[in-house]
Amino acid sequence: MRTLTHNLGFPRIGAQRELKKALETYWKGQNDVDQLLATARAIRTGNWLLQQKAGIDLIPVGDFSLYDHILDMTTLLGAIPHRFGNTGDKISPDLYFAMARGTADQPAMEMTKWFNTNYHYIVPEFDDTTQFRLASDRLFQEIEDAKALGITAKAVLIGPLTYLYLGKEVTPGFQRLDLLPRLLPVYREILQKIASLGVEWVQIDEPILSLDLEQPWRDSFAEAYHTLHDGSCRLLLTTYFGTVDHHLTLLKNLPVDGLHIDVSSAPEQLESFLTEDFSGKTLSLGCIDGRNIWRADLSQKLETLSQAASRFAGELWIAPSCSLLHCPVDLALETKLEPEIKNWLAFSAQKLEEMTTLGRGLNQGRESVEAILTASDEARRSRTESSRIHNPIVHQRVDNLTERDSQRNHPFATRKHLQQQRFNLPLLPTTTIGSFPQTATIRQARAAFRKNELSHLEYLSAMRAEIREMIRKQEEIGLDVLVHGEPERNDMVEYFGEQLWGYAFTENGWVQSYGSRCVKPPILYGDVYRPEAMTVEWIKYAQSQTGKPVKGMLTGPVTMLMWSFVRDDQPRSTTALQLALAIRDEVADLENAGIGMIQIDEPAFREGLPLRKQDWKSYLDWAVKAFRVASSGVKDETQIHTHMCYSEFHDILPAIAELDADVITIETSRSRMELLDAFVKFSYPNEIGPGVYDIHSPRVPDASEMFELLKKASRYIDPTLLWVNPDCGLKTRNWPETQTALQKMVDCAKTLRSALQA
């Protein structure tokens, strides 16, 4: 029986971020919708043809999105929140983007992390009046486009249970699972229309099966898939991001034609699926890592697949573990990477080739791919033996860590008193999260410096001028605690990684974070070492320009780890401690330079949490330890801040408190401060700054909205522990909206401060 290869999804952004550029020019009114859609069509077509040329047998259609695939599902199902005023007609691009980005009248829909990745999805909103209807023909048009190119298409849908699970109820006392009977008929209609277009297989993604589901959700799978399996299409139930063997009996009994399992992040589950009788189903093995960029050990994987094929009575397919959305597009575009390191890597285009190599090896025998396997073995040997990887100084420092290295000198209450004596801040102190708008002037100066078109002195002068201006603007607005604005930084991880040993960088290694926002994760390939101070001179200069405190701004060890492509040859906990020691040294240098407030951002802290609760403790233990190692070497008078975003903290608040940061700022505005209730119930002991406005939308909220959120926060939290700040950094915003919003924020804080002190 011939083994097929198929892909679960391909990056949407384009090899040169063409989609980002098209979206942003469209939003600025510099091109029309036809130009935007033409760019999207060109990217989709290029993706299909690339996969076809690589030899992929079944090519995904429906994985592309202009903004987010969950938002696309909301659009396809007509589940538009009432507040956006949809009349029941077809959904326009303006309405689509309004849901994602907000309007002058309506805040954007909430955005949160896609499982434990750095991708973000738009959260569906449900209430008891939510109705579903087939409201878009985009998927069907794309299928017809693919067929016209001779593509063997596999349609891609988010499954009904995952769609409901990832949404939120916007009215109390209502359970979104109760919407399933209304939802399933529309799914049936979609599947029947797909079948009418001649598509045999539908990939129906249910990644929530990697979670510990409550019984009502587990029970609903049988109802859903008995309803959907009407024979119109063959259904490939697709799971990823972890093991699903805790749902083995459920999966065995579901009326689906195939199952996809992730045997890259959870190789141990393969044995369960080979031992149980799944012979009536196609089994797709996600053996190529869809979330990291290391070249696969093809010899070992071919051996594993050969053994699986000999034991599995049904049809076996080869796939990536998950969509390749999380990987850069093509390694061939990297012309400046060290050849040795480049030889260790595989981006999305190369992962297609790895899949087809494994398929050919299974179908035609090992000898048919012997040369490729030999090259793979040599790359693996090179990486294992490379002198770039290991630094004995770093290993010794990690080995010598003691419990004292992760403890502050005294408890928070003592520190708070000393810090208030030092800084004399008012009630409800105002601050920002760190970055300010990256203007064209800033970006041009950085680019010119990288190209040696600016001397070091000229660059220093340009950045200092920007810092002076940012300090001036903050003082003019009336903020209490200032930042230097980060004009010298391109990215909060890349900036530090460029100054640490053990990191490498790409030119075009972009991946989508949300919408048009792309990030270029650095490659953490070896032991991490800080050869010299990274931020001290910038922060010292900023502090010299004002009598108000200026925060030192650092990225925390867990975020440095989570937002990099991390080496897979040692435990992540070890790499986190190496990063923590590098940051600890920077914290010490900042303190010695007279900087009294140091912010260590950990926006990715929850992102690293394993999907199953049984695995949480191990992760939280080492993640908390890493942060405390980074932050605990300072005096009591030095105030440690941290920032976290897009996170549901309800279930990990004890670990957040264990970080023992003096001040935590969090994103709360999109969720209308819902998160604060959890902090109150837990009695969070330290100071907290809940974001009072959403910086991910160009919309500047009314002062009344900010004031109400702030007043609500003051009811939840002791005002003596409350800070006032935006949700996140302001790098992606422009100055006019930034100044307007911050001025409103400061005015609201002053108004409430006066009321509380009256």
Curated annotation (Swiss-Prot):
This protein's pathway: Amino-acid biosynthesis; L-methionine biosynthesis via de novo pathway; L-methionine from L-homocysteine (MetE route): step 1/1
UniProt record, GO biological process: methionine biosynthetic process; methylation
Annotated residues for binding of L-methionine: I433, G434, S435, E486, D601
Gene Ontology MF: a single term: 5-methyltetrahydropteroyltriglutamate-homocysteine S-methyltransferase activity
Catalytically driven reaction(s): 5-methyltetrahydropteroyltri-L-glutamate + L-homocysteine = tetrahydropteroyltri-L-glutamate + L-methionine
Highest taxon, organism lineage: Bacteria
A Pfam entry, by short name: Meth_synt_1
Family: Belongs to the vitamin-B12 independent methionine synthase family.
HAMAP family: Meth_synth (MF_00172)
Protein name per its UniProtKB record: 5-methyltetrahydropteroyltriglutamate--homocysteine methyltransferase
Annotated organism of origin: Nitrosomonas europaea (strain ATCC 19718 / CIP 103999 / KCTC 2705 / NBRC 14298)
